[in-house]
Amino acid sequence: MSQNTLKVHDLNEDAEFDENGVEAFDEKALSEEEPSDNDLAEEELLSQGATQRVLDATQLYLGEIGYSPLLTAEEEVYFARRALRGDVASRRRMIESNLRLVVKIARRYGNRGLALLDLIEEGNLGLIRAVEKFDPERGFRFSTYATWWIRQTIERAIMNQTRTIRLPIHIVKELNVYLRTARELSHKLDHEPSAEEIAEQLDKPVDDVSRMLRLNERITSVDTPLGGDSEKALLDILADEKENGPEDTTQDDDMKQSIVKWLFELNAKQREVLARRFGLLGYEAATLEDVGREIGLTRERVRQIQVEGLRRLREILQTQGLNIEALFRE
């Protein structure tokens, strides 16, 4: 028997055939395997139901926290002092009175990979941390201090979900060629090569090389860990000015005044480099190369001063019970 011959026992003994010998399939059985309009409608209703439950839970939570009265400046100091001495009721009062602040901040981070309730939950952790760390004798309003910690915990949660900066693959490949050549030249020349030296090595226009190196620097400058015990990058903590509304004016003014005060505890060179690099004190954020050109220093020297300035700034903030993330963000 050839391999193409159909064996009788290969047939379904219960199969029905039409008059042409073609097996007649059970159309009812087939239709049951495909989703009907009713099935799709049911799935849509289930999805809508799940969404509605999330909305209901959110509204319920917002309704509950709406009954917590805000504290006056005097009440903040009173309850903060008692909380520092271990009074649980005062600690709870400070947390409950600022839950709406968490919601306001969390709403700014919508469509960033986490649901609103998840953002609120993360922000509440930051609020609790702020209550534990807050010292009313330092002159801050608690809302300003808490905002830093709330934003930091939310940003960290979002960071764990996704990175923000993406480059087209052809740009990445071209950039890698320039960076590899720069590394090779730095070993050969015993100094960091200039854009002109890289361009000559690759036989490329200097402007093209400079543009790509500036692109890389803008990315890495905000995507490089700040150092110390922090693995967080400036990308994850720099404020988005579009987030600020009129209601943020008071706490933003407090924050700016604090930043200016701390920057002026650095030496003049460190202060100018950090201000120019990160867009502070009225400067536009600039690359190491651009800053060096403006103040008459090499790119490498500017980088060294930046590292020294951030290290000194971290020390200053630690004496205030803060960290460098709290300064640059949120």
Curated annotation (Swiss-Prot):
It is found in: Cytoplasm. A motif (Interaction with polymerase core subunit RpoC) lies at residues 118-121. Residues 94-164 are annotated as: Sigma-70 factor domain-2. GO terms for biological process: DNA-templated transcription initiation. Keywords: Cytoplasm, DNA-binding, Sigma factor, Stress response, Transcription, Transcription regulation. Residues 174-249 are annotated as: Sigma-70 factor domain-3. GO terms for molecular function: DNA binding; sigma factor activity. One of its GO terms (cellular component) is cytoplasm. Residues 56-89 are annotated as: Sigma-70 factor domain-1. Residues 262-315 are annotated as: Sigma-70 factor domain-4. It holds the Pfam family Sigma70_r4. Residues 288-307 bind DNA. Disruption phenotype: Decreases expression of genes encoding virulence proteins. In strain JSG210 wild-type growth rate and motility, slightly increased biofilm production in vitro, does not persist in inoculated tomato cotyledons (cv. Tiny Tim seedlings). Wild-type strain JSG210 has high persistence in tomato plant organs; fresh produce contaminated with Salmonella contributes to food safety risks. Decreases virulence in mouse. InterPro entries: RNA_pol_sigma-70_dom, RNA_pol_sigma70, RNA_pol_sigma70_r1_2, RNA_pol_sigma70_r2, RNA_pol_sigma70_r3, RNA_pol_sigma70_r4, RNA_pol_sigma_r2, RNA_pol_sigma_r3/r4-like. It comes from the Bacteria. Sigma factors are initiation factors that promote the attachment of RNA polymerase to specific initiation sites and are then released. This sigma factor is the master transcriptional regulator of the stationary phase and the general stress response. Interacts with the RNA polymerase core enzyme. Belongs to the sigma-70 factor family. RpoS subfamily. This is RNA polymerase sigma factor RpoS. The lineage of its organism: Bacteria, Pseudomonadati, Pseudomonadota, Gammaproteobacteria, Enterobacterales. The gene is rpoS.
